[in-house]
Amino acid sequence: MSCRGMVCVHGVSKRFGRTQAVERAELCVERGEFVALLGPSGCGKTTLLRLIAGFEEPDEGELCVAETRVNGVAPERRRVGMVFQDYALFPHLTVAENVGFGVRRGDRAERVRELLALVGLEGYGGRYPHELSGGQQQRVALARALAPAPAVVLLDEPWSNIDPLLRASMRDELAGILRSLGATVLLVTHDREEAFSLADRIAVMRDGRIVQAASPEELYAAPADRWTAGFVGAGNFLRGRIDGELVETLLGRFPVVGRNGASEVDVLIRPELLELRPDPQGSAEVVGREFRGHDVFYRVRLADGTEVVSQRPSTELVPSGSRVVVAPHREPVRVFS
């Protein structure tokens, strides 16, 4: 195996008893890249992070950090910094002592001052974790992870315990700090919005496997399979029949991309591609709606009883019970067997 990235995972598997937590995982993270491991609970993403950190050892496969094979290497010698979900600060140590833990004594005081300034906590060095807010504790955890100048920063759902009203701002602030340092980051999350807003690439995991690793734009527009298509964003799946370069559906004919050879397929149409035009003679009916501020998600029943979802700006409110014409954008669509 060639260890050319800052993190390389090659054929890594991990089993706990009869449970296959990670199965033949393949991933390479380049220097300065921000990659998110995205998946539902129990998919193996945290186990994979712990394997990279050295808290677990793989049953098979190879792991590299900073172009060095780290199988069997102790966590403290892997050149990784980790921010845990619960931050794992030492309650009996001050902020400064937490940040300086593991830093050589001769460099400690200056390094602590530098990092507390970086995370906006100058003057907090003498406080204890219980005297800080959740957001401040998170900054301390990040400073501690950065203190030994790691090659890679690992984040295990670090914003899950933050108040939802503060989560986005804290997320953007800490991600901004990491980007300003040119850090290589691997984030574990089950939050699609978080992954899409922060990551350069997203590795989607399911049942212990990485099913697709791609940029957010590619992942949304060209998902590898039907499950991934539905997991990374809302989607309507209509039955369709391939006819040459087109596919015939209840909503008309569409150009096809990514054909798979089948004649009967499921056709992915994202909600934002379905316009609604109020029309008393329309063949479809709005049967429900969900207001989400900037957008409204409409549940629409077609003439044959099939229901689809349309995402429209909240400036175009359509009352429930309205008859409408569903007007899809005639963009190329993805199809799945």
Where in the sequence are the language-model features?
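ATPase nucleotide-binding modules
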Residues: 224-287, 299-317
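ABC ATPase nucleotide-binding domain
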Residues: 8, 28, 64, 325-327
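The feature captures the beta-strand-to-loop junction immediately N-terminal to the Walker
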Residues: 38-40
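Conserved ABC transporter NBD signature motif
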Residues: 61-69
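Helix-to-loop junction immediately C-terminal to a conserved catalytic motif
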Residues: 53
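ABC ATPase nucleotide-binding domains
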Residues: 34, 78-81, 85, 89-227
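Conserved coupling/switch loops of ABC nucleotide-binding domains, chiefly the family-specific signature
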Residues: 59-62, 207
